Amino acid sequence: MAASVVKTPKCPRRGSVKDVAQNAPRTAPTSSKEANWNWWLLLATVFLVTFATRFYKVTEPDHICWDETHFGKMGSWYINRTFFFDVHPPLGKMLIGLSGYLTGYNGTFPFEKPGDKYNETRYQGMRYFCTTLGALIMPMGFDTVYDLTRSHEAALLAAAYLIFDVGLLTLNQYILLDPILLFFMMASVWGMVKVSKSTASGGSYGLRWWLWLFLTGTMLSCTISVKFVGLFVVLLVGLHTATELWLILGDLGQPILETVKQLACRAITLIVWPVLLYILFFYIHLSVLNRSGNGDGFYSSAFQSRLIGNSLYNASMPRDVAYGSLVTIKNHKTGGGYLHSHHHLYPKGSGARQQQVTTYTHKDENNKWLIRPHNKPGPPKGKVQILRHGDLVRLTHMATRRNLHSHNEPAPMTKKHLQVTGYGELGLGDANDVWRVLIVGGKVNETVHTVTSRLKFIHLLQNCALTSSGKQLPKWGFEQQEVSCNPNVRDKNSQWNVEDNEHKLMPSVSFSVYAPGFFARFLESHAVMLQGNAGLKPKEGEVTSRPWQWPINYRGQFFSGSSYRIYLLGNPLIWWSNLVFLALFVTVFLCNAVVQQRRAGFARSAAQNQAQVPDSETVAQDEESEHSTTDICSCCTPAKEIVPKAVPSGSPEAPNPAQSLRAAAWLFLGWMLHYLPFWAMGRVLYFHHYFPALIFNSLLTGVMYNYILRVLPKWIHHVILGLVLSILVYSFAAFSPLAYGMSGPLANEPNSTMYNLKWLSTWEF
């Protein structure tokens, strides 16, 4: 395609954005129409190939695969309006439940474990929904790269890298949060680029500009409402927006009021609007899930009082706690469990071989304790004796009839604390069973109240506080939480409250007055989610991974381990070539930065040695030095530029190499933001956590491919692209059984059809 040299309009730092739009080079209408047809043809091809590959065998296997057991179950709970606890925000699970409901699923399938057959269950609608969102990532990726490069070849290659990755295909075909998350993340980046493009072409404050701004804000809110890792794309869009505002501020052709207007518009659409949407999603979540479920115990007693069917809902219990009360005692920290015991003993090497005492987050008969005087078998018969601040008590576990006990033995997990056990027979024990009850901030003789009083239990002899350390016990403790006696009696983890209170002789009162409002529950939900997320631990036999393994495709992850096997693994040719283009970008970017810095230094040196009027060569060098790699303005161009004539009408001219490099820099930043933070995370990590970063890497590959091959004639460019696409298609066909299903011998057996594809010993398919 012929090219011509055109003079570029002034940078908006010397003239207005409108000047740039008015002075933009005019292109031939015929060529523009041809480019538009090419764009639509390629986009249609991307759509067809994407949907063909994604929906092929989407309902197979017809059994639960991997985390479908969690998110399918949660979709069922939304349909049944049953409250549950999860570490992720609610939007993705609400959409899964909604898609199931609209396609005829009734919410009764148990989703117990991977491998269970769906049988007559109408699960297909939920898979179709997740797959559809996953399939829309590729067209958006195509258009995003096209807007960044104005290159059909770059856009097509980036889309091909997304389409023909069998790992992304596998992740898109099941009832999971990941395709929903990736869709909203990609839509956020797409909107960000569209806003930048519209602003650069002088379209600010037009209808299209506003629509793209609101779309971007909506997608940002949806991304972080699916998983908290959506914060990374929020940060990316925020940095990009701040950069654009900074460049608008430096546009001397515009009054400073223009910057204020732009800032206000973006604050409304990219901050206020997403926050309101985020709150709305939680309002819907808490309104729909209004029935008691197995996740109640993760939340405070007051929170539970809003759940229909919970023992605290419209509860009528004694207001005061008395001797002889049968109570449950809940740790007052966020996500705290119930004081719990059972017949099992601590194992050898974990302190005295006495009965285990733990905290447990689920309601259970083993959570009930009887409050007794410290020096009598019980209160006087027929009389009520109120429990007060400073009283000495024994707590007897009702199911086992052993007393809450501590002694001078180290706790099993927190060695600086003392062990807490169940001790004695039928309520008879020793002096180590005596605890002093203190109300936090209480006064002498102040009454202990149900739910509202925050309590400390101080051991009389050891002077330590009953504490939930938050540490998880091993298998011998059923992975419940350790309870210990902490010498630091001021530790906030040593605060408790009485949740359930039964006493035959005391009048009951309604507790509905203590039910919290929406914002109190909204804040508590976040505290519980964040704490749960940070404390995630791998289950026994579960395959986890570390961040260094992800970019090199070191090990995959089984989605289905039955005779019909599904294995999550990236297309190695795509993943490893992505790393090559990452390295190329870093190399080119650094070299370009060095060259620009040297040119700037040369220009300054030459200017000092010139006469008062510099010659034209020095001026040209000075102008060229302005276009450094740190200038990210989407509408700045060098003094001279080669521009293809065939550009779609109404769109900005093709970016020059420096602009392409700056576009690649933003994609590289997106990759870093979605990858590097995982190195600092202490929680359990899995291979699928890398896929948001993979999308940025694949888009970067398309941009860098165009940057590197831009100097070649078009026909050579097309030949190379054809060869690359052929290799991608072939590799996809070879590795597609990983996504579509494998049967027969494993790949490490010579008679396996996958034998020659096991390139790394760590691949387990």
From Swiss-Prot:
EC number, as in UniProt: 2.4.1.109
Domain of life: Eukaryota
Subcellular location as annotated: Endoplasmic reticulum membrane
GO molecular-function term, one example from the UniProt record: dolichyl-phosphate-mannose-protein mannosyltransferase activity
Residue positions the entry lists as glycosylated: 80, 106, 119, 290, 314, 445, 751
One Gene Ontology biological process: protein O-linked mannosylation
Keywords, sorted A to Z: Developmental protein, Endoplasmic reticulum, Glycoprotein, Glycosyltransferase, Membrane, Repeat, Transferase, Transmembrane, Transmembrane helix
Transmembrane intervals: 35-55, 128-148, 175-195, 206-226, 228-248, 268-288, 566-586, 667-687, 689-709, 719-739
InterPro entries the UniProt entry points to: GlyclTrfase_39-like, Glyco_trans_39/83, MIR_dom_sf, MIR_motif, PMT_4TMC
SMART domains for this protein: MIR
Pathway per the UniProt entry: Protein modification; protein glycosylation
Tissue: At the cellular blastoderm stage, expression accumulates in the ventrally located mesoderm primordium. At germ band extension, mesoderm expression is seen as stripes of strong expression. A very strong signal is also detected in the invaginating gut. As the germ band retracts, mesodermal expression decays and becomes restricted to somatic muscle precursors.
Gene null: resulting phenotype: Death during development, the few adult escapers exhibit clockwise rotation of the abdomen.
Main location: endoplasmic reticulum
Reactions the enzyme catalyzes: a di-trans,poly-cis-dolichyl beta-D-mannosyl phosphate + L-seryl-[protein] = 3-O-(alpha-D-mannosyl)-L-seryl-[protein] + a di-trans,poly-cis-dolichyl phosphate + H(+); a di-trans,poly-cis-dolichyl beta-D-mannosyl phosphate + L-threonyl-[protein] = 3-O-(alpha-D-mannosyl)-L-threonyl-[protein] + a di-trans,poly-cis-dolichyl phosphate + H(+)
GO cellular component assignments: dolichyl-phosphate-mannose-protein mannosyltransferase complex; endoplasmic reticulum; endoplasmic reticulum membrane
Domain MIR: start-end pairs: 318-374, 384-440, 445-501
Membrane topology: Multi-pass membrane protein
Subunit structure: Interacts with Rt/POMT1.
Biological role stated in the UniProt entry: Rt/POMT1 and tw/POMT2 function as a protein O-mannosyltransferase in association with each other to generate and maintain normal muscle development.
Family to which the UniProt record says this protein belongs: Belongs to the glycosyltransferase 39 family.
PANTHER family: DOLICHYL-PHOSPHATE-MANNOSE--PROTEIN MANNOSYLTRANSFERASE (PTHR10050), PROTEIN O-MANNOSYL-TRANSFERASE 2 (PTHR10050:SF46)
Protein name per its UniProtKB record: Protein O-mannosyl-transferase 2
Organism: Drosophila melanogaster (Fruit fly)
Gene transcribed to yield this protein: tw
